[in-house]
Each structure stands twice: as C-alpha cells, then as structure tokens.
Amino acid sequence: MYKYLFCLALIGCACADNINKDAQIRSFQNDATDAEGNYQYAYETSNGIQIQEAGNANGARGAVAYVSPEGEHISLTYTADEEGYHPVGDHLPTPPPVPAYVLRALEYIRTHPPAPAQKEQQ
C-alpha cells in the first residue's frame, strides 16, 4: 500500500506543471551605458517577476518583485556600492535585539576607560 502511494506521489511530482516554464516577457527597457557610465534596465514577465536597476560606475540601485513558490509576494530593494550589497525586504531575516545587559556593559566600558599601564620598576 505504501509503495503504491509513494509511486503515485512520485508520478504526481514528475507530471506537475511548472508555471515558470512558459513565462513570457511583457515589457523590457534597456538604456545602454552612456559616456558617463550610467545605465538602467527594467523588465516584467507574465509570471509576475518585475526587475529594475539603474546605476553607474560607483554603484547601483534596484528592485525585484516576484511571487514565491509558497504564494508569498516577495519585494526586495537594494543598493550596491563601494561598501557592498545592501538588500532590504520584509522577507529577509533580521538579527535579534542586543540584550540590555550587553548594552549596559558597553556603556560601562565607554565611561570607564582603562587606567594607563604602569611600567614595571626594576
């Protein structure tokens, strides 16, 4: 019985229709790099993917939006510059808050600098 259900599930997965395989480009804009190195592009597909980016030799800014396989709407904005890639989105993990005792310890260290080291007398 379990073998039958397993085979049936396997066949179902193999035959599942992939929504992304037939996606078509609905709109496309590409402004090639100009003399100063500025560029921008944007496109949208029939399966809901939207991407846009603009930038120059110093960095770029952009946005991406799509629907995840779980049906969640994902929206991401980002900048990329000499300091790295900086994504922003509600779906991204965030670090936990710094505990109060750590903040107190850091404040204590800041307000009580170490005494200057004394040379050993010989």
Swiss-Prot record:
Summed up, the tissue specificity of this protein is: Imaginal (anterior) epidermis.
Q: Which UniProt keywords apply?
A: Cuticle, Signal
Query: GO cellular component annotations, sorted alphabetically?
Result: chitin-based extracellular matrix
> Which residue positions does the secretion signal occupy?
1-16
KW Signal (keyword) present = yes
Report any Pfam family annotated for this entry: Chitin_bind_4
Q: Which residues form a coiled coil?
A: none
Q: Name one GO biological process term.
A: chitin-based cuticle development
Domain Chitin-binding type R&R, by residue range, is 36-96
GO molecular-function term, one example from the UniProt record:
structural constituent of chitin-based larval cuticle
What InterPro entries does its record include?
CHIT_BIND_RR_consensus, Cuticle_Struct_Prot, Insect_cuticle
Q: Does the keyword Signal apply?
A: yes
Q: What does this protein do?
A: Component of the cuticle of the pupa of fruit fly.
- Supply any other comment: The sequence shown is from genomic DNA.
The protein, known as: Pupal cuticle protein Edg-78E
Which source organism does the UniProt entry give? Drosophila melanogaster
- Phylogenetic lineage: Eukaryota, Metazoa, Ecdysozoa, Arthropoda, Hexapoda
